[in-house]
Regions:
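A glycine-rich beta-to-alpha transition motif near the start of alpha/beta enzyme domains, typified by
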Residues: 37-46
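N-terminal targeting leaders of membrane proteins
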Residues: 7-11, 22, 43
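Short, strongly hydrophobic alpha-helical membrane anchors
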Residues: 1-15, 162-170
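The first (N-terminal) embedded transmembrane alpha-helix
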Residues: 1-4, 25, 142
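N-terminal membrane topogenic signal
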Residues: 15-18, 136
Length: 170
């Protein structure tokens, strides 16, 4: 059956998706924490960490666990969509700490090969910071619900927030 919902209503629903919004907020907070840690630990201002992969904490883990927590909180933790969101979260976190990390370690070794073994090596070395340690994934996975659930419970949906600020979208 074809849905006759007007496109503006679909856009409104999309932008008012609390699970999506708060999952993305958790991801953003994790990325900002990377910048803060760069300043605190390495004593340097390097905004590039905001768009790089790897590092503490895992923003992908924060994204998927924050989203899954919102889905569970909204629909119930026995709902099939929560099960799906949780399984996707586990796959993403396994990938970050397993496969992507292994690829980064391999790149590190390849970059360390002597020039005599690899005479046609690219001028730019392979990217080594691809994945996360288990601790980085754990911290990200705890940050997700810690950011998303209070946002969902106390602030609500994005359009609800904007209408409360006087934007007239409610």
């Amino acid at each position: 059956m074809i849905d006759a919902t007007p496109s503006h209503a679909v856009l409104r629903e999309f932008f008012d998706n609390s699970s999506l919004t708060w999952g993305l907020m958790a991801c953003g907070v994790a990325q900002l924490l990377k910048l803060f840690l760069e300043l605190l630990v390495h004593r340097r201002w390097r905004p590039a960490v905001l768009i790089e992969t790897g590092g503490m904490p895992s923003s992908h883990s924060a994204l998927v666990t924050g989203t899954a927590a919102c889905v569970g909180w909204t629909l119930g933790f026995d709902h099939p969509l929560f099960a799906l969101a949780a399984m996707v979260a586990f796959v993403v976190m396994y990938d970050a700490s397993g496969i992507r990390r292994a690829a980064g370690l391999t790149a590190e070794r390849v970059n360390g090969l002597p020039e005599s073994l690899w005479p046609d090596a690219p001028e730019k070395p392979l990217k080594e910071s691809l994945g996360h340690s288990r601790l980085q994934v754990l911290v990200g996975s705890l940050m997700g619900p810690a950011v998303a659930l209070p946002g969902l419970e106390f602030v609500g949906s994005p359009l609800h927030l904007l209408s409360g600020l006087g934007a007239g979208l409610g």
